[in-house]
UniProtKB/Swiss-Prot annotation:
Name of the coding gene: rnpA
Name of the molecule in the record: Ribonuclease P protein component
Reactions catalysed according to its record: Endonucleolytic cleavage of RNA, removing 5'-extranucleotides from tRNA precursor
Role summary: RNaseP catalyzes the removal of the 5'-leader sequence from pre-tRNA to produce the mature 5'-terminus. It can also cleave other RNA substrates such as 4.5S RNA. The protein component plays an auxiliary but essential role in vivo by binding to the 5'-leader sequence and broadening the substrate specificity of the ribozyme.
Organismal lineage: Bacteria, Thermotogati, Deinococcota, Deinococci, Deinococcales
Top EC class, one word: hydrolase
Pfam families hit by this protein: Ribonuclease_P (PF00825)
Entry's Gene Ontology molecular function annotations: 3'-tRNA processing endoribonuclease activity; ribonuclease P activity; tRNA binding
Gene Ontology annotations for the cellular component aspect, listed alphabetically: ribonuclease P complex
Keyword line: Endonuclease, Hydrolase, Nuclease, RNA-binding, tRNA processing
Keyword Nuclease: yes
EC number of the protein: 3.1.26.5
Amino acid sequence: MKGEREFRRVRQQGVALRDPLFTLRVTDYRPRHGEVWRPQAIIGIVVSKKTLRRAVDRNRARRRVREALRTLPGGLPPCRAILLPNPGVLTVPFPELQAALVRVLAQVPGRVKRKGGGPGGNRRSAPPGSAPLTDDGRLRGEP
């Protein structure tokens, strides 16, 4: 995400999804002014000094979360989000961090609602099957 305006919009209008490892504030995907509609995930990672004192730890937390997001199976749902890691992100094994992200991101398509565009309007919904988990909690595409 770029600029204070986008962060402020997500902070004020976003839905908070909490996990012991992080908090994810998320809103619907809306293209920037003049951009073409290309639904994608735009995620800003914010680590405060209050959460992790040392810059080394803040940077390590950012890198771990960024890599976990990059390597997620099934990709990311289209949204704008702010991810706020907790100190546990540094010590938890990497597969657990990925599993926590999958759990929380699976809730995103159902929790985020687009504003306006009533019946017959210009509403776009998430395509069926866009969540990375099936109804019984398994990753989509696994036996």
